[in-house]
Amino acid sequence: MIEFSSGAVRDLKEIFDWIAKDSPAAAFRVVGRLRQNIEVLDDFPQLGKTGRIENTFELSVSGLPYFVVYRSGVDGKSESILIDAILHTSRNYPTVE
């Protein structure tokens, strides 16, 4: 089961809004492609590489300048996936606080 954090939902909305300023159709395509890649994690939760933050994974989205930060086995359930963030590859991640 895949769940989205409130931050990941916000990320998707911001990605959509940014692209939609120039092309609503492209925004739908990009967000749709991101969601398709995320859905694959339901069957292949270890598909991403080890993340830069402990206990996370990062999934690159082929052909798009975005990556998905997620956790597998949330709440002790091996089949659960939590999407933490969806970020542009140009972002400084993780941010230093």
Residue ranges and their predicted role:
Residues R35, G63-L64:
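Σ70-family region 2.3-2.4 aromatic/basic alpha-helix that recognizes the −10 promoter
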Residues M1-N55, G76:
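Basic, Lys/Arg-enriched alpha-helical interface segments
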Residues V61, F67, R71-E97:
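Enriched for short, Lys/Arg-rich terminal
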